[in-house]
Amino acid sequence: MPPKKAPAKKLHELAAEVRVGHKINDISKKTFIVGKQFATGGFGRIHTCTEEGKSQQMVMKIEPSTNGPLLTEVVVFNRILKKELIESYKKKKKISWIGLPYLIANGYFTYESEKMRYMIIPKYATSLEAVRETNGGTLAMKDSLTVASCILDALEYLHESDYAHADVKAANILLEKQGVYSTAVLVDFGLAHRTTNNVDKPDKKRAHNGTCIFTSTDAHRGNNPSFRGDIEILAYNLMMWATGTLPWMALESSPEKVFDAKQKFIAGLPGTLQNVLKNESSAVVGCIASMFDISMKTNYTDKVDMGKLKKLVTDAIQKTSSDGKKTPTRQKKLAEEDKNAVTPKRSTRRLAVKEESDNKDNDEVEVKPEKKATPRKRTTRKAVEVNNDSDDNEEQYENPKSKSSRTQTKSKRAKEEDVDDEEEIIIPKSSRSRSKVQLSGEGSDVTTPSSAASTSRSRSIRLGLTSSTASSNKVAKKIEQKYKRLSMNKSSLVPVTISVASDKSPTTSTPSSSSGLRSKRKSSEDVGEGITLKTQVLITPAIKKAKTKSGISSATKASPTELRRVPGVRNFPKGRRSMIIKETSAKYKERLASRQTKPTFDDSSCSSEV
């Protein structure tokens, strides 16, 4: 039985990683220091490098000595891309720039017992592909045509040297300086082919060679790279740079389908090109269509008329530049017209619009805010209450009233603010006998006799109001602090919601001592005419969050987010609205915090003070 054949080696192997700082001695007695790797190719790795004793960075390509692509490129550089050859060509053509790199050094070195090939060329700023991706996949047409002009000059040099590039694309085009497209450089000669022995005889083994979406129809058929093929590839690239895509982009994984799509596209020219470049000018479409036309009419082995092509591209650049100059002028004119028009500032205040008749040419509208109303003095409260009444909101923008009407308004608003918050207290069953509750027709006042000596003069305490009597305020706060906290855990506590008496008809009670005793014996049913007593189980959030006369609950006022949604608040000017919301929410947050954090007190002290 014959021995099994060893598995075939891969066509191209990736080079081993060379450490940074490794020194390579060239045959020219120069030493180069390997820098960081910044890219990889089908043949190997690409590093930065410097010459020992110098700081200028260069590019070093490294691959195993058994690989072929870098060898092909080294041969091309040694034949036609030496620095002295390029300088001689520039003098002959009387040009100052040509978009081709030159060879600095090349050779072999051994790294970890592996023989490697290297080549050093100049380093450039960035690639056109990186710029295109940064711009969202496209390039400005003027920039694209400028790059195309540089590439045509580079291809002319290669074609005169009997070489076809065969792999023109944005990834193989570098910019010497960032943002400067007039000095674009064509690199990567791994697929470059010498055309002296070209014969129009397709070979299926060579079919679809190159970058599938850009490669020429000659390469799809299996022919060697040709001069006309380079122009066809450049035309495909211009389509890609203008639109960011190609009609056969989705078919890239199937080279045969891409080839069929390209044949149909070329057969339908120039209509198919116009469908792709809908947003471009006729000069641009005509230029690219002519590139396809010249490519198709040139024989496989013939050289392309570069002079005609460069003139087409130059004319298209000039027309694109002239079109680009007209557009900013038009935009500048429109901007000046917009500047002349006066745009009114956003405001919630009523605006008086006055039209100027002096200037007949420019119909400008002058917007003047109405005279600001005289600000009202703040009430005795620290925070400003926010009411939902539309009348209160409109008062800020109306003309100031007379002195007497303002005084009446202030007193009315002060009364409304006093009765704004309906308070909730909780009275334990054990202390009901010590309290005396009297009800009035419109509201209710809680009267608590302090002792037998003071029965001749009883006081009416309005719970939850800002009273001038310090003792009544103190008692109300103590009752609230103690029994509000205890109501959370003890079922014996009964919450009592007491509606506030109207300021118009306040009632006072002056009971005798005997009537006070009788009131102690009153049952909860007699008292319940104006006071609703509920057990802890029956307490609902609606009762705990009793709404005020303005229709806004204390919980809403304590929350800036909820307070901002109140319809009346939106009528305030923006700066004033934020200040009111901040002050109001801070006030009610402080009130809620004081109810929860203040210490408790003894029942006996409370009853004695009452």
Swiss-Prot record:
What does the entry report about post-translational modification of this chain?
A: Autophosphorylates in vitro.
TM regions (residue ranges):
none
User: Which gene name does the record give?
Assistant: vrk-1
Positions of the region Disordered? Answer: 317-476, 498-530, 544-577, 590-610
Q: Does the keyword Chloroplast apply?
A: no
Which superkingdom does the taxonomy of this entry point to? Answer: Eukaryota
One molecular function GO term is:
protein kinase activity
Residue positions binding ATP: 38-46, 61
Q: Which GO terms describe its biological process?
A: cell fate specification; DNA damage response; establishment or maintenance of cell polarity; gonad development; regulation of fibroblast growth factor receptor signaling pathway; reproductive process; signal transduction
Please identify the protein, giving its name as recorded.
Serine/threonine-protein kinase VRK1
Region forming the signal peptide: none
Q: In which tissues is it expressed?
A: Present in germ cells at all stages of progression from the mitotic zone to mature oocytes, but not in maturing spermatids (at the protein level). Expressed in the ventral nerve cord and vulva cells.
